[in-house]
């Protein structure tokens, strides 16, 4: 898989947003699982 550097693309920002989305997803899933366990 070869990736050509694109000046219009910002891989750092994309990685940061994907990282934040992943953390948010894990956080929401943790809250849901904790609510299921506590109830």
From Swiss-Prot:
One cellular-component annotation, GO: plasma membrane-derived thylakoid membrane
Superkingdom to which the source organism belongs: Bacteria
Signal peptide segment: none
Pfam family, one: PsbL
Localization per Swiss-Prot or TrEMBL: Cellular thylakoid membrane
Family: Belongs to the PsbL family.
Protein's recorded name: Photosystem II reaction center protein L
Species annotation: Nostoc sp. (strain PCC 7120 / SAG 25.82 / UTEX 2576)
Gene: psbL
């Amino acid at each position: 898989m070869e990736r050509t550097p694109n000046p219009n693309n910002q891989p750092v920002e994309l990685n940061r947003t994907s990282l934040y989305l992943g953390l948010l997803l894990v956080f929401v899933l943790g809250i849901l699982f904790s609510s299921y366990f506590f109830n």
